[in-house]
Amino acid sequence: FVAASNEIVLVTTPEPTSITDSYSLLKALYKRPDFDPSKVCIRVISNRAASKEDGSIVFNKINSVVMQFLNGSLEYLGYVPSDAMVEKAVRQQKILSIYDPTSKAARSFEEIAKRLLDNESAALDEKRTISHVFSNFFNRKQ
C-alpha cells in the first residue's frame, strides 16, 4: 500500500538502527519504477525523542540523506517525546489520550493529528481518497 499512496507518514526513532531502517525503506520506495516522488508527500514523525530538538535532529538526518542520495525531500510532521505515561497506558490497555490526556506524548499526538487534518483539508481532492489509493494499488498490479 505504501507505493500506491499519495501520502506517507514515516515514524522513526532516534536510534541509529531505526534511522537506517527508515532510509532503507525510502530507498526501496524510490527505486520502484512506478514511484513518482513528485506525486507523493512523505512526512516524518520522530517518535520517543528526548526533546523537540532531538526530534528535529532525527528528521534532519533522514531528510539530508534523502536529498543527497535520492534527490527527494521529506516534510517534518512533528515529534512524540519519550513519556512514561505511554508505557503505563499500554500496561493498563488504555488509550493514552484517555488514560492521561495531559501527558506530553498525548499532547504531541494531538498536535500531529491537527497538522494532518489541516493538511487534509487543504488538499482535499480525489487523489487523497481511499478509493484512489485502492485504484492505484490495483492498477499497478496489472
Regions found by a protein language model. Give the residues of each.
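Phosphate/oxyanion-binding loops and surfaces in catalytic or ligand/nucleic-acid-binding neighborhoods
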Residues: 65, 69, 83, 115, ...
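NTP-binding/hydrolysis catalytic cores, primarily Walker-type P-loop NTPases
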Residues: 95-142
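Beta-strand-loop-alpha "switch" segments that mediate conformational coupling across diverse proteins
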Residues: 68-95, 109
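Short amphipathic alpha-helical segments
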Residues: 57, 61, 81, 104-107, ...
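Short secondary-structure transition/capping segments
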Residues: 28-39, 63, 85-96, 120-134
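Conserved catalytic-core segment of NTP-binding enzymes
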Residues: 1-78
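Residue-level recognition of oxygen-bearing side chains
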Residues: 24, 85, 104
